[in-house]
């Protein structure tokens, strides 16, 4: 895993800093999954189908990213499996210098963090129908869960160090997108108003009505064209911060999940070190992914590692200050 991280960093040295960070998560309600289920089955009963459909859609997405958002120089992607079961892909894309986001308008064309306004009721044009469909997809897939209030400590996104959401939700309202600088991330436009407000279902333990009102503060950045095509959670972030490069790639290559297991013996043996072992665990989705021999990740270019040691001798590394 560390060697793959170094390969990715070598691509950055050669081609330049990343331009886009894309995350795609499988949708168990994809029509390809639903029509393959038996009458008494649910998606969680057929992770083999979910893995196959996700792999096919991921290949299509990787092709689209070669030119849909700008001319691509290089990319790297890694497949990860959530503890809740659904596979997702993290993709870092390096675009040409001419296609990199340089201003607010360019960032808005690549990624937005707003709920699409609802067209007029009497407007039945194709554009209005697409707008309605996009709004429904954003509310279904691109709205962050409600992690505010005291109940937020029980949410998956809670960060004890921040005493709040690890993704910094909810964001402040912002009238215009700002590009940021080398130390500050770009801020997406998140306007305030009734046009960008909607009601979505939520956990009844947080609301007696089973609904919550969401604004642009809770929207995960997305690309409209990609969301309409793939109908799943598809986060598209524009990377403008130079110091975030190593963070992105270390996040990609952080490795698989592990679990600590305690071993209890019938006879009393005072060996506390051996009583605890660290094991990898595989969920159903990851197991099928490996059975089908799907790729766990790939770099668009081949990196040749040069040997820096004498033949038949151990390689040595040295940290440069």
Could you say what each language-model-derived stretch is?
Residues 1-321:
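Extended, structured polyanion-binding interfaces
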């Amino acid at each position: 895993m560390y060697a793959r991280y170094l390969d990715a960093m070598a691509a950055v040295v050669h081609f330049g800093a990343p331009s886009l960070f894309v995350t795609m998560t499988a949708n168990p309600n994809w029509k390809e999954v639903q029509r393959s289920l038996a009458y008494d089955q649910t998606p969680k009963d057929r992770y083999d189908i979910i893995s196959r459909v996700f792999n096919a859609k991921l290949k299509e997405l990787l092709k689209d990213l070669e030119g849909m958002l700008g001319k691509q120089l290089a990319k790297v992607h890694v497949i990860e499996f959530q503890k809740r079961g659904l596979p997702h892909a993290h993709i870092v894309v390096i675009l040409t210098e001419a296609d990199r986001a340089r201003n607010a308008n360019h960032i808005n064309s690549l990624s937005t963090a707003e709920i699409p306004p609802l067209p007029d009721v009497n407007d039945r044009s194709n554009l209005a129908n697409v707008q309605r469909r996009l709004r429904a997809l954003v509310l279904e897939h691109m709205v962050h869960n409600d992690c505010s209030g005291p109940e937020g400590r029980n949410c998956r996104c809670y960060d004890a160090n921040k005493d709040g959401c690890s993704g910094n939700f909810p964001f402040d309202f912002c009238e215009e997108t700002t590009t940021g600088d080398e130390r500050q991330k770009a801020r997406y436009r998140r306007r305030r108003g009734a046009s960008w407000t909607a009601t979505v279902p939520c956990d009844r333990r947080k609301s007696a009505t089973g609904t919550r009102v969401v604004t642009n503060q809770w929207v995960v950045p997305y690309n409209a064209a990609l969301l309409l095509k793939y109908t799943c959670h598809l986060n598209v972030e524009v990377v403008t911060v130079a110091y975030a490069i190593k963070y992105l790639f270390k996040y990609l290559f952080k490795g698989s999940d592990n679990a600590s297991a305690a071993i209890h013996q019938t006879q009393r043996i005072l060996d506390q070190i051996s009583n605890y072992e660290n094991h990898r665990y595989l969920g159903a989705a990851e197991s099928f992914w490996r059975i089908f021999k799907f790729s766990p990740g790939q770099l668009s270019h081949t990196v040749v590692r040069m040997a820096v040691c004498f033949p038949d001798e151990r390689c040595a590394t040295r940290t440069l200050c």
